[in-house]
Design a protein with these regions (language model features):
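NTP-dependent small-molecule kinase module
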Residues: 2-10, 142, 146-197
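Hydrophobic anchor at the beta1->P-loop junction of P-loop NTPases
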Residues: 15
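The conserved Walker
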Residues: 19
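Conserved nucleotide-sensing/catalytic segment adjacent to the nucleotide-binding pocket
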Residues: 37-95
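A glycine- and Lys/Arg-enriched "phosphate-lid" helix/loop adjacent to the NTP-binding pocket
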Residues: 100-155
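Hydrophobic positions on the alpha1 helix immediately C-terminal to the Walker A/P-loop
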Residues: 26
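Active-site signature of alpha/beta-hydrolase-fold catalytic machinery across serine-
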Residues: 29
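Conserved lysine of the Walker
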Residues: 23
Length: 197
């Protein structure tokens, strides 16, 4: 009996991008389409009270990521690039980079944060996102707006450099720069490869 054809994206996929680029939405959709586990790095990182393991207990955060990606197939959504590279990039097949324009990211962040705050959505079972503090640019790292505006070009340059690094030559990088490209990417994606029997 012939072996099933591998999926064109592989079995281990990472979705990255700036804040509000749609990483979790696309990652969850990919995982469902491919019938593999979905790993959201924010869910592994944030404890009640907006305590981030990446800052308070990096070893514990890294261990959580290792455990979540121990299997042979998964879709990971989120950045945390240092931790991602240390834990699973050596086994990564495909990285989908959501490189949307900064004005669009700001608008998406405003709409998302407002919706979450109005509905008091509980994120990752632990926290409710505030709205007004996200807009307080002068508060630096406490403001999501600050992160988007000040880190956009830096993150873009960093990702472009990673794409050229020999150590990551085994990874297929897919760069999506508009919402239409993301939609077309999803629509063109085949379903899960049939399992061997």
């Amino acid at each position: 009996m012939p072996h099933p054809q591998p999926h064109p994206l592989g079995r281990r996929i990472h979705v990255m991008g700036n804040s509000a680029s749609g990483k979790s939405s696309l990652g969850a959709a990919l995982a469902e389409r491919l019938a593999v586990p979905f790993v959201e790095l924010d869910a592994l990182n944030w404890l009640p009270g907006w305590v981030g393991l990446n800052a308070t207990d990096p070893d514990a955060f890294e261990q959580r990521i290792r455990e979540a990606t121990a299997g042979d197939a998964w879709v990971v959504a989120g950045s945390y690039s240092r931790f991602s590279q240390n834990t699973f990039w050596d086994r990564l097949d495909t990285l989908v980079w959501l490189d949307l324009p900064m004005p669009q990211l700001v608008w998406r962040m405003l709409c998302r944060s407002w919706r979450r705050w109005r509905r008091q959505e509980l994120l990752w079972g632990t926290n409710v996102e505030p709205f007004w503090p996200q807009l307080m640019f002068w508060r630096g790292e406490e403001s999501l707006l600050w992160w988007i505006v000040t880190q956009h070009e830096r993150k873009r340059r960093t990702m472009l450099a990673w794409m050229l690094e020999p150590r990551w030559s085994h990874i297929r990088f897919i760069r999506l720069t508009t919402s239409k490209e993301i939609t077309r990417f999803q629509q063109a994606l085949p379903g899960a490869a049939p399992s061997a029997t």
